[in-house]
Amino acid sequence: MKKRWLAVVLAGALAGASLAGCSGPGPQGPIISPEDPIEEEVTINFWGWGDLAEQQNYQTLVNQFMAEEGNENITVIYRGINSATYMTTLRASSRNLPELFYMPDYDFLEWVSAGSLKDISAYVEEEELSQLWPQAVDEYYYNPDTATLGQSEGAGLYGLPKDLGPFTLVYNKSLLDARIEQKGLNADEIYAEYLTPTKAMTWEKFRTLLKMLVNDANNDGTPDDSVYGISHYEIETAVYSNNANFFNDDASEQRITDQNFIDALQFIADLTLVDHVMVPSALQSDMDGFTRFVNQQCIFSFMGPWDCAQFWGFDIPFTYNILPVPYNGENPDAMSTAWVGSMGYCVSARANSLQTAAAMRLAKYLCMNEEAQREFYELGQQVPNLVSMATDEYLNDTQGLLEGKDPADRSVWVDTINGTSDTDRIGGKVRPRYYTYSSGWYDDFLTYIDEQGLWTGERTAEQICKAYAPSFQSVLTEMKANLG
């Protein structure tokens, strides 16, 4: 899963060139079931991304797959690529794709609509899919006739979910406890009021807590000990947790001028401009949120399940835990809503019958094999894709594989994936870029609000959003046109 610890003020690279015509279907041949014996030798290339810990985890699982009985004739060449360059590398190879590769959810629509991905519906049984998180499976359905995402009549399945990754609030418990003691606060009261894994804080409570914890005696906006309350704030999380969005349901009309959206952006800016508890924009480029958190220069940040692999590998000298993301308590329709990222295991449309069978055997092993899923969560890679495993074995550590490992409240990740209900106000939502033809618009938006001075107080969120709305609407209209 791609790391998203970058500061909210930073802009990413623009989307790459169109994929149309780059890698359409090649000679297909008959369908070979992944369960049938593979008696011919076949080599498949499998590309993934991630930090070194994630790459090592995947090499371990690939080696185990090849060693299993029945896979003797399958050779998997695994290539782990840094997340910052993965999509650039994949685009450069679009005419000669690996047989199996990661596809981030926010690039899925562009690639599937270009014909680069194989429809794998015939290679998976409904009974197999029913074991997985429904929303994870739904993300990789696409109907080429109507150019629509999700399960529908005529839609095909173009990927198996690698994972669902809720990006939730994380705090340095050791640092927080020391700060509570230093300030003479009542620890039991603080935890009961603010730090409950089953009840999210409101924005107002979160701001209050951060101001209590930050040392800024002269109120000059700079902590006396260089320890900020929070490293940065995830824009999508703030927007979702105020019942807002970037556009309407079919991504055809902008919604950045809605008051809920504007209030969400201003909430983030005010953490620095008014409360002085978040790292200011001038310092955001000096150090990313992940590094700042690991270096204990902030109490709160954000993390996903995949970050455990790095934390455990670093053997960090503090205890950490996670919480549901805060929401706007003044909005009766708002709920704690983290963004939930995902990757798909996708097969190249040009893979032949034997390659496809081998690639699907590996994809199914990584996605839904019980032993593989157990190994993944033990390695700190993900919440299990298997719902029964996630909601019992993983949640309660019935196998004893997570004893002594943070976070203690990993139930927050499961709760976020599980979604909301009348009684459950904690949930998650796929990132908005998933719904659009390309994802570059998001980085363009971040660049614009940065250049316009939202984070430095030169302009308000309302001024910036209203000024940018016509340009954003043009981009949405163009992307819809690209889908036909």
Walk through the language-model features, giving the residues of each.
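Conserved N-terminal structural module of periplasmic/extracytoplasmic solute-binding proteins
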Residues: R4-A11, L19-S116, E128-Q131, I180-E189, ...
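Beta->alpha turn/N-cap motifs
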Residues: D51, M103-D107, H232-I235, D286, ...
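Extracytoplasmic/periplasmic substrate-recognition and gating elements
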Residues: E72-T75, Q151-A155, V274, F314-S388
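Extracytoplasmic ligand-binding clamshell segments of periplasmic binding protein
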Residues: S83-S93, T222-V227, H232, S241-T319, ...
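Short helices/loops that flank or line small-molecule/ion binding pockets
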Residues: Y86-L97, A114, L175-L176, K205-L213, ...
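Hinge/lid segment of periplasmic solute-binding proteins
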Residues: D105-T168, E204, N321-P326, K405-A408
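Helix-loop-helix "hinge/cap" segment bordering the ligand-binding cleft or interdomain interface
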Residues: Y123-E127, P144-E234, F246-A282, A349-A357, ...
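Long, aromatic- and glycine/proline-rich binding clefts that accommodate carbohydrate-like moieties
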Residues: L323-V325, Y377-L454, E458, E478-G484
